[in-house]
Design a protein with these regions (language model features):
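N-terminal intrinsically disordered, cationic/polar leader segments
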Residues: 5-149
Length: 149
């Protein structure tokens, strides 16, 4: 079963972490919700995702040995898709399994970038490993992410 993130994402931007970059802390009850919230926060740096219609979809499959690398590769894939397909994403249905390694399968939806319709805040070039952390808490999951803008 695929999990969709809640309509009100649980993240906050961290202004004092990286001056030239964008940083945020995200939360989720499940890993799927956490990763979806991180994806949404990444695109919120660039655009008001409420203005991005889920008209175009992409399938994603990522495998990694640990959660930090899985999140890094997931966000990297989204940034790459944004750059190559010229799409902002706003909806994320994800499923994460753990066997010998973590596997993220999902569908992401977005809309072609339209500078007349969408006000672009700033461009995200990449996710960084600086202060990157995915951590299980007593009441769910937390991630800290710094993006190169």
């Amino acid at each position: 079963m695929l999990h969709q993130i809640a309509t009100m994402p649980n993240f906050k931007f961290l202004e004092d972490i990286a001056i030239a970059d964008a940083a945020f802390e995200a939360y989720g009850d499940t890993l799927e919700e956490l990763f979806g919230t991180c994806a949404l926060a990444t695109f919120e740096v660039m655009v008001d995702t409420r203005d991005v219609k889920p008209e175009q979809k992409e399938e994603i499959l990522i495998k990694d040995l640990n959660l930090d690398d899985l999140l890094f590769d997931f966000i990297s894939e989204l940034v790459c898709l944004k750059d190559t397909h010229k799409v902002f994403f706003s909806k994320f249905d994800l499923h994460i399994n753990k066997n010998e390694e973590y596997e993220l399968r999902g569908t992401v939806w977005g809309e072609k970038i339209d500078y007349k319709k969408q006000e672009v805040r700033r461009d995200v070039k990449a996710i960084t490993y600086h202060m990157l952390e995915v951590k299980e808490m007593d009441n769910g999951w937390r991630a800290q992410v710094v993006l190169d803008t």
